[in-house]
Amino acid sequence: MNTKILDQLEFNKVKDQFTEYLQTEQAQAELRDLVPMTNPERIQNQFTEIQEMSEIFIEHHGFAIGSLRDISEPLRRLELDADLNIQELIAIKKVLQASADLSRFYADLENVELIALKRLFEKIEAFPSLQGSLQSINDGGFIEHFASPELQNIRRQLKACDDAIRQTLQDILKKSGHMLAENLIASRNGRSVLPVKNTYRNRIAGVVHDISSSGNTVYIEPRAVIQLNEKITQLRADERHEMARILHELSDQLRPHTAAIANNAWILGHMDFIRGKYLYLHDKKAIIPEISDNQTLQLLNVRHPLLINPVANDLRFDEDLTVIVITGPNTGGKTVMLKTLGLAQLMAQSGLPILADKGSRVAIFQEIFADIGDEQSIEQSLSTFSSHMTHIVEILNTADSNSLVLVDELGAGTDPQEGASLAMAILEHLRLSQIKTMATTHYPELKAYGIETQHVENASMEFDTATLRPTYRFMQGVPGRSNAFEIARRLGLNEIIVKEAENLTDTDSDVNRIIEQLEAQTVETQKRLEHIKDVEQENLKFNRAVKKLYNEFSHEYDKELEKAQKEIQEMVDTALAESDSILKNLHDKSQLKPHEVIDAKGKLKKLAAQVDLSKNKVLRKAKKEKAARAPRVGDDIIVTAYGQRGTLTSQAKNGNWEAQVGLIKMSLKADEFTLVRAQAEAQQPKKKQINVVKKAKKTSSDGPRARLDLRGKRYEEAMQELDAFIDQALLNNMSQVEIIHGIGTGVIRDAVTKYLRRHRHVKNFEYAPQSAGGSGCTIATLG
């Protein structure tokens, strides 16, 4: 798009309004480089980014990047094998820290569905090792002692020397205080000295480094500290050398990652820019417009972004409307209306929110042209007309059906009759070329053109004859009328004279009366529309209030539900503990076989609702603070991942435990099981509910479940359920299981086959007989 239109409509001033909402230099640079786009997909993507940022603010009450410098120049220097200075390293350190913070924010993000922003969040790369290395430089620009052992040693020696010097000088102060001009230790040329009275300069042996302007004080470095000061000077040089080496090493660590760090910096800046767009939208009560696909546009209550308290107006360009002609006298706001339309389009095509109401729709134009300028004096009329015509010629030679043309005072600056004819001919050319055009004129002849010509519509700016002031309201469909007679009458001109003037222009008076009636009807319609909008706003406020109350109720409901779930889980755990005790006693008395004990326990567990308390903060804290007792061989345990009971059989050298769980021997870490007697057993995570059906009844009691139905499951969910199902089957001594996966696309079926092929407790597997499901069901033999 041509850049001339940006200057004509003062688009850079609009962009400046976004500056106060941006925190990073990268976002400021992106704003400076922002120009209108012509690709609808790119524009829509930026609108989606703003919408998703709005949802983040609503759900999480904020989002911030922090103040970040532009690091493009330091990164360029790294690529040239240059070493960075401390301030440049601090700038990169802050970018890496902000990147890590943003990644954590995204990981903790809940209740927000992201599409456009998700792509940005997931492209951020973390550099924990680089962050750790850069911690050796604090934000004040100081290299910490721990940056290297050598630096730490140098600074330790410096402190020792400095302490020794101070102690020596303090001793001199005590003994020779009467010889000193001031009872303090001064510094000259980086060396510690004493301010000695000139009369005693020969009483203290040492080197004179300075004399006061009055000559009464001599700054002497006592001989006793000269050697120490020399050592400090050398240590300072060593310190500078070591710090330079550290900066070189840090630069070398960053060098291989310049591209990724640059990408992170761009994402942070772009995120900040999106945040700024949202804050502008929120503060200015702006909106994200819809995008039409047929060059129609509808702007509801659109406002000029650069005016203070602008009047809001509605404007539409339907598919069958090509030209809008705004007629009527000057100073009514016609030019402002032209600029308002142009700026709304430029802002929207730049991915910015516009000052309008919801339901507004913009078109996507490949070019926007304008001829807008203030009228010049009569003496300059020729140059004014020539200037306008030069612009018009350029526009007509370049514009096409994908363009928007804005012309102010078309045909002005020449003979009125010729100017009106020329204006009409130009508008007709634009109409026939199907170029969307809005033009202003004060020529009354164009009113008839707007009424009589297809795809052309008149418009005007409302004028309040009671106050004799323009209202700046845009009245589409109503041509402008002359208010000269009414103004003259209200200003006190003799009524006889006014009547005589009206009689001399009977035809024009009839037209004006018709226009006046149209204006009255339009004003009445606008009042009704405003009333409807007010009602809609009240309904919107009511809906928001109801939604807020609902959210508060839902929050309290969730808290009470979690509390109830905890109480229920405690009751269930107590019952399960009692059942464990009963079954153990029966087993000890050899009244049940081992596999019958496991089977009975499984049936008892089915009575317990599996309550998900994994998000219960109180329980998580209690779990962390529980008094742990060291496990021993022979202890009964609960395997956390499966909720199954087992027994510890031995402990390996690496600290892991061997456990017997049903038919399976497992190697477990200490945090992968809990002791049966520990209170924390009540806190085990909720097991994944497995979709199974019972085996055919072979005895009077229910048998263990041996069929898993994975139809309709997602891949990850299906694999989790399959893994848990096979473990449960092995623990219940099942020899054969059925897995129903259906045929479908074959993804789940292939995944089941791969899983069974790798499992060491699956002897063999095959598809079920055709009568029992065929290739939609797999039968696996366990052992």
Curated annotation (Swiss-Prot):
Assigned EC number: 3.1.-.-, 3.6.4.-
Q: Which cysteines are joined by disulfide bonds?
A: none
The cross-references to SUPFAM superfamilies, in alphabetical order and at most eight, read: DNA repair protein MutS, domain III, P-loop containing nucleoside triphosphate hydrolases, SMR domain-like
Residues annotated as binding ATP are 328-335
Can you provide one Gene Ontology molecular function annotated for this UniProt record? rRNA binding
Among InterPro entries, the record links this protein to: DNA_mismatch_repair_MutS_C, DNA_mismatch_repair_MutS_core, DNA_mismatch_repair_MutS_sf, MSSS, MutS, MutS2, P-loop_NTPase, Smr_dom
- Please state every residue range assigned to the domain named Smr: 708-783
Q: Name one GO biological process term.
A: negative regulation of DNA recombination
Q: Which UniProt keywords apply?
A: ATP-binding, DNA-binding, Endonuclease, Hydrolase, Nuclease, Nucleotide-binding, RNA-binding, rRNA-binding
Q: Which family does it belong to?
A: Belongs to the DNA mismatch repair MutS family. MutS2 subfamily.
The record, for PANTHER family, names: OS10G0509000 PROTEIN, OS10G0509000 PROTEIN-RELATED
Biological role stated in the UniProt entry:
Endonuclease that is involved in the suppression of homologous recombination and thus may have a key role in the control of bacterial genetic diversity. Acts as a ribosome collision sensor, splitting the ribosome into its 2 subunits. Detects stalled/collided 70S ribosomes which it binds and splits by an ATP-hydrolysis driven conformational change. Acts upstream of the ribosome quality control system (RQC), a ribosome-associated complex that mediates the extraction of incompletely synthesized nascent chains from stalled ribosomes and their subsequent degradation. Probably generates substrates for RQC.
Q: How does it assemble?
A: Homodimer. Binds to stalled ribosomes, contacting rRNA.
Q: Which NCBIfam families match?
A: mutS2
Name the UniProt record assigns to this protein = Endonuclease MutS2
Gene name in the database record? mutS2
